[in-house]
Amino acid sequence: MSIEINNESAIEVDEPVIQRLVTYALDTLHVHPDAELAIVMVDEGAMEQLHVQWMDEPGPTDVLSFPMDELRPGTEDRPTPAGLLGDIVVCPQVAAEQAVTAGHSTMEEILLLTAHGILHLLGFDHAEPDEEREMFGLQRDILIGFAMSERGR
């Protein structure tokens, strides 16, 4: 699996933990081991520019996903074909603000946003209540499973 992480933000992030989360999530979702994914951490100014350009929304946001090959989750018998999943852009400053509200660490929020971005790259959305239940349920399952796997490290 090719997972590139590029931190262009002023906030330090634990890249090895992000790498392990992405690997865990993609394995859980039966994505082909040759799939490619890039994650970029950016400051608020860069995120605001992307948010305006791609979503026509003012201000910075927490995470944006840019799917490439429109891959979907696979199954144990039929994994997702190899391909380019796309890019996830995370703003650690926005994540830090949200973490305070949520009552957990900035890194936990960054992991949540990364899992959220992966699900968007794989075609999940949360525009409708049933889609939101499915996506947020998978997101929760990934984060809980990952946390349990990290305890064993």
From Swiss-Prot:
It is found in: Cytoplasm. One of its GO terms (biological process) is rRNA processing. Its EC number is 3.1.-.-. GO terms for cellular component: cytoplasm. SUPFAM superfamilies: Metalloproteases ('zincins'), catalytic domain. HAMAP family: Endoribonucl_YbeY. Single strand-specific metallo-endoribonuclease involved in late-stage 70S ribosome quality control and in maturation of the 3' terminus of the 16S rRNA. This is Endoribonuclease YbeY. The gene is ybeY.
